[in-house]
Swiss-Prot record:
It holds the Pfam family NPP. Residues 23-97 form a propeptide. It comes from Oncorhynchus keta (Chum salmon). One of its GO terms (molecular function) is neuropeptide hormone activity. This is Pro-opiomelanocortin. The keyword Nucleotide-binding does not apply.
Amino acid sequence: MVCAPWLLAVVVVCVCNPGVGGQCWDSSHCKDLPSEDKILECTHLFRSGLQDESPEPRSAAQQSTEESLSLGILLAALTSGERALDADPEPHSDKRHSYSMEHFRWGKPIGHKRRPIKVYASSLEGGDSSEGTFPLQARRQLGSWEDEMVGALGNQGAKAQTKVVPRTLTVTGLQDKKDGSYRMGHFRWGSPTAIKRYGGFMKPYTKQSHKPLITLLKHITLKNEQ
């Protein structure tokens, strides 16, 4: 691939100057051309040799135009070959996959969920009647399960009947609670005794304890009036 543009450049030079063809291919310089500089040196060498041998004098303008034309064609051929090599270094493999974040929970999207396959007994047995859809063992299991459910429901109903309280009793109990003050008997501090109330420091005075105080107040008022 690398030698192709160089050979193309040599062919272009030979076509532009027909006399160069025979001399260039016979020489050892043109057989092994490792770089672009060698190709340019070879073309300049044989062009100068042809100019010395040719009897027709050429002007400087013609020489410059021919040189620029040949060099332009040579450089265009070389650059096109290099671009082709850079553009396609290796054929792209279709096996290249995108980066999948497998270490994350959302790395791979979940496809369609596998649903359980429903197998009907009618399709297995091939019967059309409703009684023949289930096998004998399945029908026995269903029958025993129904019996257990009926028994459990019966036991629950009997327990509920025993626990039922007459409505009249509940109504009277509610009325009694509304009439009387609610006492928190289920708490430790619901109804403390009179002695232990306020920690025993403030003992309630009895009716007899108030009598001396009342008589004292009466005497004071009588003295003030007199």
